Amino acid sequence: MNIEAVFVDRDGTIGGTGHFIHPNEFAPYSFSRDAIQILKDHNIRTFACTNQHRISRGEATLDDFNKEFQSYGFDDAFICPHSSDDACNCHKPKPGMLLEASKKYNLDLTKTVFIGDVGSTDMLAAHAVGAKKILVLTGWGYGSLKQYRESWAEIEPDYVAENFLEAVKWIISKCEG
């Protein structure tokens, strides 16, 4: 498997609970920085891709999030600051952030992977552009797979991982295998 880039959701995937936590207070899981470094060591671009509607409410800024993602080692961050009620094309499950990344970095999105914890947003956005889909069971992941499965029933994840690090190890095994 030739992977050009990996997109990673924030809340519930790299840390937190799945709920909004301001970047100044957000703590990544103990393995998240290692997972990002493994991708970088294998020359795989790593992008944060997150809905953060609290920006539109003035509770945080794009700069707050960009600094956070840069400190973790992400190559870039694609952040939707809008609420789900706004008529934007970037709020997941719409694929606007992925399309923006594709244009900016000349990516073939069918050669990318999306790692996230929410089936009805992360997995649907990935599916819309033909990206591989990895659902992690942290954050909302377990609930997405069980009680909320009907909201994305027509989509199957390519892999279900216990967490972000396991997802990255699966990607690397497919690249090397």
Where in the sequence are the language-model features?
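Active-site neighborhood of HAD-like aspartate-dependent phosphohydrolases
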Residues: 1-47
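Non-cysteine beta-strand/loop elements that form the S-adenosyl-L-methionine
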Residues: 5-11, 74-80, 136
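Active-site flanking residues adjacent to catalytic metal/cofactor-binding acidic residues
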Residues: 8-10, 50, 115-117
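A short, structure-level motif marking secondary-structure boundaries and short turns
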Residues: 19-22, 51, 82-84, 107-108, ...
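Short, flexible loop segments at the rims of nucleotide/cofactor-binding pockets, characterized by
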Residues: 23-27, 55-57, 88-90
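Substrate-recognition element of Asp-dependent hydrolases with the DxDx(T/V) motif
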Residues: 32, 36-66, 74-86
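Asp-based, Mg2+/Mn2+-dependent phosphohydrolase catalytic module
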Residues: 60-76, 85-114, 118-177
